[in-house]
Swiss-Prot record:
It comes from Arabidopsis thaliana (Mouse-ear cress). Pfam families: Ras. This is Rac-like GTP-binding protein ARAC7. The gene is ARAC7. It comes from the Eukaryota. One of its GO terms (cellular component) is plasma membrane. SMART domains: RAB, RAS, RHO. The keyword Nucleotidyltransferase does not apply.
Length: 209
């Protein structure tokens, strides 16, 4: 029996956007109500997705500037990044382009990304919205996905567990079934550009790199 394929999944994003809560929720099926560590301990377990078993390794990172020099050490060998921002924090949304994409493309230029908007429960809470109107919409999240060329965009809530499993199932699928980005040989003068069309469809409309 062959060994399960190992997939290293690294979560990145601003501090306090809920990366660690999301990981704890995914691995324990419950929302942490007491102490929440700054960084989640590395986790590894066999996971079944679409009938295929993989060994999923989860790596958490601290988003604060104090860890900027150490954080890239976690990127080595990564198969997929889960890049998170908070749906109730415009600053964390803007930092995806300002901070995180430059960092990821510098240290891991060819690793695919799943973009995740966290704290969905608060964005959908009418009581919360009464005092906080500067939230990120689904349309804005999808626009950002296209801008950075992420393979997928998912909104989730660790508190209600909505879509948390979908985040990591999607990350696994992206690694197992990467978008086709083969270029048509240039020696053929009458090529049909079919490679670009396929990549766009598989990626859900994103532009192939």
């Amino acid at each position: 029996m062959s060994a399960s394929k190992f997939i290293k999944c690294v979560t990145v994003g601003d501090g306090a956007v809920g990366k660690t809560c999301m990981l704890i929720c995914y691995t324990s099926n419950k929302f942490p109500t007491d102490y929440i560590p700054t960084v989640f301990d590395n986790f590894s377990a066999n996971v079944a997705v679409d009938g295929q078993i993989v060994n999923l390794g989860l790596w958490d990172t601290a988003g604060q500037e104090d860890y900027s020099r150490l954080r890239p050490l976690s990127y080595r060998g990564a198969d997929i990044f889960v890049l998170a921002f908070s749906l109730i924090s415009k600053a964390s949304y803007e930092n995806v382009l300002k901070k995180w994409m430059p960092e990821l493309r510098r240290f891991a230029p060819n690793v695919p990304i799943v973009l995740v908007g966290t704290k969905l429960d608060l964005r959908d809470d009418k009581g919360y919205l009464a005092d906080h109107t500067n939230v990120i919409t689904s349309t804005q999240g999808e626009e950002l996905r296209k801008q950075i060329g992420a393979a997928a965009y998912i909104e989730c809530s660790s508190k209600t567990q909505q879509n948390v499993k979908a985040v990591f199932d999607t990350a696994i699928k992206v690694v197992l079934q990467p978008p086709r980005r083969k270029e048509v040989p240039r020696r053929r003068k009458n090529h049909r550009r079919s490679g670009c069309s396929i990549a766009s469809i598989v990626c859900g409309g994103c532009t192939a790199a």
